């Protein structure tokens, strides 16, 4: 029986023999395509090949493509674990032709592989064709499929299109008949939704182009795109009707049972199925640098992870277990996908951190859910507000709540959940732009409706004239504002940049006839630029013409910091890996801040390398170019884009730096990003770049803060001044500071050792307080001693020394150093069966104002507050020994 790995290899090797290039799977995170959450089919990486935009060295290709369907319209998450064939992660086997062969070759290729290499009985196979595709019908007859097993389908199931317009064409599908013991009918029949006839391969014939009016013409370049689910064909070839009964899933399910100490099959099997599936999707996503968060791809990952973790808890797991399953996955899939082994440490660490975090709130969240649903019956609906509270307070994604209620037959009011989510986002949006409550935003919508949006002129100029179209004060429109008043000024056009994309808003001056205002900040909302202003003289009024001038020095500083973040982003990816993605930024006048996906602190060595690389490209002084193009053209150049950003028909692309192994049309551009901010004209205008440090921003996100230009130079001067002061204090040249410092540290360590030795000698010879000499009490040797100038950390060594000296006995030491009181008790090994050091300690510490303490029968330590009670403490220990 072939394994899943064998089947993958057989498929790829077969098409390699037919002249196909074996192409590696593209990443799950589509390169330069923020419109697509995850790669969900084999053709995604070849999209531009089919349209002719991308020309490759081959015209035939075959792949085993990693796919995830757990977000957007392709969302199988709710069904995963409960059905035989739903997965969040799956592999799509495919063969492709870009204007080379067509139906006459594609259909025989498929038939030969299935009936020859895979040895599937021909009488178990059915095929479908689009109802007008006579050519495909005849080819199927020619390869030997009886007419009664070739079914014409008139629905969209057998016609594929990339979008409302563009390449499209008919499909042909191959089905396997599992037998009449399973309910269901052939494709096109009333019972087609049953499980008897299962689609195993889909062949798409891209032969047409559809236009907006619905008309179609034949394409000059006709292509082939096919897809076969590896898990489905593996189930068939391994003699099962359920993907989760194939060799890979059996292995993962049994591993899940082992780490959760539960049974792999029976009533608990569904939990293991969920865990096995989600382990795959989460591990592959983390290996590509996707980390759990509350937005975008990171939130989808978090949803999948937490669903798996809940099912682990249903199996009785009270501690993190998902990370323990990663080695099992790597052992099964690591050979085909080396990125799993390379990222194993990151995957395990991310699982453990996320599960530890989630387990802290899981029980409380489930209690709230139980309380809220306790009176609900099958068919009832949980209020959306409750589901949102679970999400907002306890980190329960909506589908986790739905999954938890599935067994009770209770639905969730998803519209109510969406409404609560929307209300929170509006509140956050209003607060985020400094405009108060969400209700205040309505005034800006009204202005847009009446006056239109603001035209931004600031890319080309810092000075401009415009007309005041509205004034807003305290959330309401006003006609005018006088000296001393604060007001938001809205004009038809402006050179002032409105805060967005991490770049702060501009400041400057605005003058009108008879008045002036200082612009302290500029915000942007719904296409309006809000000039936050203080009227400094006279009066300004709606309808007035205005002259505007941006603060040039401040704008220049902001530009330098923004351009530096682009260079920093690229340098981070080069140093740490392609998983690095921007998660946030601040480009202010005095500093820059850049948040990025990375799961651990950046080493000093890497920080130095990153800083050097950025400064290299600053000194290169290359031109910074900006171009307007379509999003597709920008992605084709390799432009970095932020997932979740909505792009219009045109985008602004900022490029800088020359690198021999770069990107872009010439392959020599260092950094290319979609960006609406303002930038320097030459990289040299940044001046210099200094990293202040790296810190944690949130789970899986690091933050680098840095300076540029004059601020960076001033920082370096301050650091040089401090170094000169240190050198002077050490009586050394700056270049010799480290050597001198090391010598001082060595000298300090030697003195500390000498002091410790002297303290021990003094203590062993006697000290201040009673009981310095050993005495016989209750038939045991006892030594009680009060010591001044001895720290608590020295007591353990003194106890051991006294044990060696007296041979057999009980020791109590009370020490005071710098106002801190420490107590230690020791019992030699031969007496621990009769008396414990812990009991001696507990008897003594109350006299010095201490409580408790703890340790082992032979050694115990505690603390106190009042050294004057040392004699009483020793007497208390003696009393214990006397019995």
Swiss-Prot record:
Pfam families: DHHA1, tRNA-synt_2c, tRNA_SAD. Zn(2+) binds at residues 562, 566, 675, 679. Signal peptide: none annotated. SUPFAM superfamilies: Class II aaRS and biotin synthetases, Putative anticodon-binding domain of alanyl-tRNA synthetase (AlaRS), ThrRS/AlaRS common domain, Translation proteins. One of its GO terms (cellular component) is cytosol. One of its GO terms (biological process) is negative regulation of DNA-templated transcription. Its EC number is 6.1.1.7. InterPro entries: aa-tRNA-synth_II/BPL/LPL, Ala-tRNA-lgiase_IIc, Ala-tRNA-ligase_IIc_anticod-bd, Ala-tRNA-synth_IIc_core, Ala-tRNA-synth_IIc_N, Ala-tRNA_ligase, Ala_tRNA_ligase_euk/bac, DHHA1_dom. It is an enzyme of class 6 (ligase). It comes from the Bacteria. Its main location: cytoplasm. Binds 1 zinc ion per subunit. The keyword tRNA-binding applies. It catalyses: tRNA(Ala) + L-alanine + ATP = L-alanyl-tRNA(Ala) + AMP + diphosphate. Its cofactor is Zn(2+). It is found in: Cytoplasm. Consists of three domains; the N-terminal catalytic domain, the editing domain and the C-terminal C-Ala domain. The editing domain removes incorrectly charged amino acids, while the C-Ala domain, along with tRNA(Ala), serves as a bridge to cooperatively bring together the editing and aminoacylation centers thus stimulating deacylation of misacylated tRNAs. PANTHER family: ALANINE--TRNA LIGASE, CYTOPLASMIC, ALANYL-TRNA SYNTHETASE. Catalyzes the attachment of alanine to tRNA(Ala) in a two-step reaction: alanine is first activated by ATP to form Ala-AMP and then transferred to the acceptor end of tRNA(Ala). Also edits incorrectly charged Ser-tRNA(Ala) and Gly-tRNA(Ala) via its editing domain. Belongs to the class-II aminoacyl-tRNA synthetase family. This is Alanine--tRNA ligase. It comes from Ruegeria sp. (strain TM1040) (Silicibacter sp.). The gene is alaS.
């Amino acid at each position: 029986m072939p394994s899943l790995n064998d089947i993958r290899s057989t498929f790829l090797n077969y098409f390699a023999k037919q002249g196909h290039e074996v192409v590696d799977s593209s990443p799950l995170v589509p390169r330069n395509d923020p419109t697509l959450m995850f790669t969900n089919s084999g053709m995604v990486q070849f999209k531009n090949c089919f349209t002719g935009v991308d020309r490759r060295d081959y015209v035939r290709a075959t792949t085993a493509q990693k796919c995830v369907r757990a977000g957007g319209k392709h969302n199988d998450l709710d069904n995963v674990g409960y059905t035989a064939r739903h997965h969040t992660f799956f592999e799509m086997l495919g063969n492709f032709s870009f204007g080379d062969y067509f139906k006459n070759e594609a259909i025989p290729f498929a038939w030969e592989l299935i009936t020859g290499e895979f040895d599937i009985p021909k009488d178990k196979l059915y095929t479908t064709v689009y109802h007008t595709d006579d050519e495909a019908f005849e080819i199927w007859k020619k390869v030997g499929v009886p007419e009664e097993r070739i079914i014409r389908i008139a629905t969209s199931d057998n016609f594929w299109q990339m979008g409302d317009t563009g390449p499209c064409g008919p499909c042909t599908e191959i089905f396997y008949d599992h037998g009449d013991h399973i309910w269901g009918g052939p494709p096109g029949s009333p019972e087609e939704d049953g499980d008897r006839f299962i689609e195993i391969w889909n062949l798409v014939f891209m032969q047409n182009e559809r236009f907006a009016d619905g008309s179609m013409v034949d394409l000059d370049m006709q292509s082939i795109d096919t897809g076969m689910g590896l898990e489905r064909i593996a189930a068939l070839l391994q003699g099962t009707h359920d993907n989760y009964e194939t060799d890979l899933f059996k292995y993962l399910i049994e591993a899940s049972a082992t780490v959760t100490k539960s049974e792999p099959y029976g009533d608990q099997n569904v939990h293991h199925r969920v865990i096995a599936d989600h382990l795959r999707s989460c591990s592959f996503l983390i290996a590509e640098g996707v980390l759990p968060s509350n937005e975008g791809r990171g939130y989808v990952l978090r949803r999948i992870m937490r669903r798996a973790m809940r099912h682990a808890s249903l199996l009785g797991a009270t501690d993190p277990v998902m990370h323990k399953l990663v080695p099992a996955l790597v052992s099964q899939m690591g050979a085909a996908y080396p990125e799993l082994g390379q990222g194993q440490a990151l995957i395990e660490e991310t699982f453990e951190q996320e599960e530890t975090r989630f387990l802290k709130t899981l029980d409380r969240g489930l209690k709230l859910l139980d309380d809220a649903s306790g009176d609900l019956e099958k068919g009832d609906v949980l209020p959306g507000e409750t589901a949102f509270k679970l999400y907002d307070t306890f980190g329960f994604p909506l589908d986790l709540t739905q999954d938890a209620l599935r067994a009770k037959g209770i639905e969730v009011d998803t519209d109510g959940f969406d409404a609560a989510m929307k209300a929170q986002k509006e509140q956050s949006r209003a607060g985020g732009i400094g405009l108060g409550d969400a209700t205040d935003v309505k005034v800006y919508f009204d202005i847009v409706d009446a006056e239109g949006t603001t035209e931004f002129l600031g890319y080309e100029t810092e000075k401009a004239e415009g007309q005041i179209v509205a004034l807003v004060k305290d959330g309401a429109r006003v006609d005018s504002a006088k000296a001393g008043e604060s007001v938001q000024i809205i004009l038809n056009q402006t050179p002032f940049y409105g805060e967005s994309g991490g770049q702060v808003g501009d400041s400057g001056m605005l003058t009108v006839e008879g008045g002036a205002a200082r612009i302290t900040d500029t915000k942007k909302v719904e296409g309006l630029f809000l000039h936050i202003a203080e009227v400094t003289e006279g009066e300004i009024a709606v309808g007035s013409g205005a002259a505007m001038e941006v603060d040039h020095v401040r704008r220049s500083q902001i530009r330098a910091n923004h351009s530096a973040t682009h260079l920093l982003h690229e340098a981070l990816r080069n140093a740490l890996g392609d998983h690095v993605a921007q998660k946030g930024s601040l480009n202010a006048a005095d500093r820059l801040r850049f948040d990025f996906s990375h799961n651990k602190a950046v080493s000093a060595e890497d920080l130095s390398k990153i800083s050097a690389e950025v400064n290299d490209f600053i000194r290169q002084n290359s031109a910074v170019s900006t171009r307007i193009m379509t999003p597709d053209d920008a992605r084709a150049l390799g432009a970095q884009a932020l997932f979740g950003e909505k792009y219009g028909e045109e985008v602004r692309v900022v490029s800088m730096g020359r690198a021999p192994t770069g990107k872009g049309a010439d392959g020599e551009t260092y950094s290319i990003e979609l960006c609406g901010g303002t930038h320097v004209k030459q990289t040299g205008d940044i001046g210099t770049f200094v990293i202040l440090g790296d810190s944690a921003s949130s789970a899986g996100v690091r933050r680098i803060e840095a300076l540029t230009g004059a601020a960076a130079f001033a920082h370096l001067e301050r650091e040089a001044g401090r170094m000169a002061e240190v050198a002077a204090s050490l009586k050394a040249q700056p270049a010799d500071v480290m050597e001198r410092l090391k010598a001082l540290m060595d000298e300090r360590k030697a003195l500390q050792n000498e002091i410790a030795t002297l303290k021990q000698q003094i203590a062993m010879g006697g000290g201040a307080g009673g009981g310095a000499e050993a005495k016989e009490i209750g038939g045991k040797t006892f030594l009680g001693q009060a010591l001044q100038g001895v720290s608590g950390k020295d007591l353990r060594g003194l106890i051991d020394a006294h044990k060696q000296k007296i041979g057999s006995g009980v020791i109590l030491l009370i020490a005071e150093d710098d106002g801190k009181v420490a107590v230690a008790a020791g019992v030699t090994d031969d007496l621990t069966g009769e008396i414990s050091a812990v009991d001696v300690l507990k008897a003594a510490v109350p006299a010095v104002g201490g409580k408790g303490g703890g340790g082992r029968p032979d050694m115990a330590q505690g603390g106190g507050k009042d050294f004057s009670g040392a004699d009483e403490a020793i007497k208390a220990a003696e009393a214990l020994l006397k019995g």
